């Protein structure tokens, strides 16, 4: 008797109902994310960026043994709190006399994981800085961001959600 592999770590919400009408987008985005490390889903509010990002992440969980992780940023008004929000998602604690981004990058380095940053537009510069630093330090990291505008980080691919 063989046992099933344990589920990958992560914090993605369960899909509450079926996902209809974006199958082609999901296929194209999954293929795209195999080649790029930063993907931003852009479009106006309410168009379905978050739902598409979460579904894509759920579909890609088998590709990321260290999990797929969602950080919801809608209620993060201050970009200076962004590293703390991301660190808390992973259970990473701040170290005295060390920038939190350095602690975060060290903890994630060598891990193959997918990070979904949701609702970045109101702190887009802070998100861009964080993503740029994490991608530079964590070669196996992939990032999906949702925003009304691109992050404008090096290597970012922008997908306009119709």
Predicted regions mapped to residue ranges:
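A generic short alpha-helical patch detector that favors 3-5-residue windows
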Residues: 4-7, 21, 40, 74-78, ...
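Post-nucleotide-binding-loop coupling segment downstream of the phosphate-binding loop, primarily
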Residues: 18, 24-47, 51-112
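Residue-level detector of conserved, well-ordered beta-strand and adjacent loop positions
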Residues: 13, 20, 42, 71-72, ...
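A conserved switch/coupling segment of P-loop NTPase cores
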Residues: 30-35, 52, 57-65, 98-162
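Residue-level signal for pocket-adjacent positions within structured domains
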Residues: 7, 14-15, 47, 148, ...
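Conserved adenine-nucleotide phosphate-binding loops and their immediately adjacent elements
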Residues: 1-31
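Generic detector of short, locally flexible boundary/turn motifs and exposed helical patches
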Residues: 4-8, 79-83, 107-110, 124-128
């Amino acid at each position: 008797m063989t046992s099933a592999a344990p589920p990958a770590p992560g914090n993605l919400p369960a899909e509450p109902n079926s996902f209809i009408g974006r199958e082609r987008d999901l296929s194209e985005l999954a293929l795209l994310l195999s080649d790029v490390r930063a993907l931003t889903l852009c479009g106006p509010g309410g168009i379905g960026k978050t739902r598409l990002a979460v579904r894509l992440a759920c579909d890609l969980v088998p590709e990321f043994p260290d999990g797929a992780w969602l950080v919801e940023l809608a209620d993060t008004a201050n970009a200076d709190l962004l590293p703390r929000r991301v660190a808390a998602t992973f259970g990473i604690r701040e170290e005295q006399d060390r920038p939190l981004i350095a602690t975060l990058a060290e903890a994630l380095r060598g891990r193959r994981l997918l990070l979904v940053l949701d609702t970045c537009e109101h702190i887009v510069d802070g998100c861009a800085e964080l993503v740029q630093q994490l991608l530079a330090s964590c070669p196996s990291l992939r990032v999906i961001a949702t925003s009304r505008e691109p992050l404008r980080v090096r290597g970012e691919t922008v997908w306009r959600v119709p």
